[in-house]
Amino acid sequence: MAPPHFLLVTFPAQGHVNPSLRFARRLIKRTGARVTFVTCVSVFHNSMIANHNKVENLSFLTFSDGFDDGGISTYEDRQKRSVNLKVNGDKALSDFIEATKNGDSPVTCLIYTILLNWAPKVARRFQLPSALLWIQPALVFNIYYTHFMGNKSVFELPNLSSLEIRDLPSFLTPSNTNKGAYDAFQEMMEFLIKETKPKILINTFDSLEPEALTAFPNIDMVAVGPLLPTEIFSGSTNKSVKDQSSSYTLWLDSKTESSVIYVSFGTMVELSKKQIEELARALIEGKRPFLWVITDKSNRETKTEGEEETEIEKIAGFRHELEEVGMIVSWCSQIEVLSHRAVGCFVTHCGWSSTLESLVLGVPVVAFPMWSDQPTNAKLLEESWKTGVRVRENKDGLVERGEIRRCLEAVMEEKSVELRENAKKWKRLAMEAGREGGSSDKNMEAFVEDICGESLIQNLCEAEEVKVK
């Protein structure tokens, strides 16, 4: 009996590609399924995919978004890419489904990530089941779903105070200027609202968001996370790091336990020159050792209005002072750093992957959200999971150095015992969910069984056991 064949299409951005690939690998390992991973040529040109080409039952299909070498920087570029994604992506999926339907391994189900609203329509055209792989928390999905159902009232959950405007995904706030993102979420949610019991695969775990995962009885929400590298759950640290790793790991080795502040805002978020200076001054004045990752964002899609300097150029005037207290690197293995005994605090933009990593590795945070789902993630970290302290902006939207120092001292001193105890609790629960045979593996098996039938999944699991023996 042929294994089920999943067509998994993902938006061409690192924050979408990484969890999607991890989901694909876990799906294959746990159920013996075949996965064809579909994305843009640019993903391969920009080296977003590594160490996946030799995975059995995992193959790749690419199409062009018109920007094969990247370089998207203007609104017009993004509009053009959106059109190309829809036209070329639709054709690539349709041609593949058509070409395989009478062969040994026809497509069983189509899985897609956010911002690809045309993908489930292809599945519907070919009468295939589809599922959305939601790479943000379940609560954020619920906020969007509730909003576009026409209920604009405040969304509430037990143990979480009412959401203020500052807690909402930025695309739903009155100050949102990204109409394209708002329209994309609206189209996606309106499609799902019309579906009968749509399946949403969510990068979370059962014990982290139990209320949010069961908020809508008409939606089949399946927790399949945390979608993080398997090394975390097996207990082995990934040592395949880049050139700078020896310098920062040796530096961390020289520090005492829980004494270092790790600062990283990911690859997409860029701080203004004023904000960079306030953060730098807070770190200098605090006199605690820190490791600050400042990446090259010269090819970023979103730039700070009126500023052409890179972040590394913005700190030039006080870099010497910074390096007297801490260390600045252009890249590090975040998982390796967060796993290090010396790290006691993570200053993060609260992207969902970074948020999950902080929970899984048990590191308290200073939540410094910027846009998209990050404000909601920060709310959850501070109030629901109680593993961090969130910064507050002034009336001009700037987080001042005094506020940053307040939060750092709270995490490193005043609330350190409470926050670390909570972080340990979530680390244990996350490990239980993410380990082989944990709740997320079981949820994944149930999803495949639901799609393909109970007898097929039993046969596949038995075949996998024989193969292992």
UniProtKB/Swiss-Prot annotation:
Q: Does the keyword Glycosyltransferase apply?
A: yes
Q: Which reaction does it catalyse?
A: (indol-3-yl)acetate + UDP-alpha-D-glucose = 1-O-(indol-3-ylacetyl)-beta-D-glucose + UDP
Q: Which residues bind UDP-alpha-D-glucose?
A: Q334, H349, W352, S354, E357, D373, Q374
Name the Pfam families for this protein. UDPGT (PF00201)
Q: Sorted alphabetically, which PROSITE patterns does this protein's record hold?
A: UDPGT (PS00375)
Q: Which domain of life is it from?
A: Eukaryota
Active site at H16 (proton acceptor)
Say if the entry is tagged with keyword Transferase.
Answer: yes
Residues bound to an anthocyanidin are H16
GO BP, one annotated term: response to salicylic acid
Keyword terms, alphabetized: Cytoplasm, Cytoskeleton, Glycosyltransferase, Transferase
User: What did gene disruption experiments reveal?
Assistant: No visible phenotype under normal growth condition, but strong reduction in 4-aminobenzoate glucosyltransferase activity.
Principal place where this protein is found?
A: cytoplasm
Enzyme kind, highest EC tier: transferase
Q: Which PANTHER family match?
A: GLUCOSYL/GLUCURONOSYL TRANSFERASES, UDP-GLYCOSYLTRANSFERASE 75B1
Record-given protein name = UDP-glycosyltransferase 75B1
**Species annotation:** Arabidopsis thaliana (Mouse-ear cress)
- Taxonomic lineage per UniProt? Eukaryota, Viridiplantae, Streptophyta, Embryophyta, Tracheophyta
Q: Which gene encodes it?
A: UGT75B1
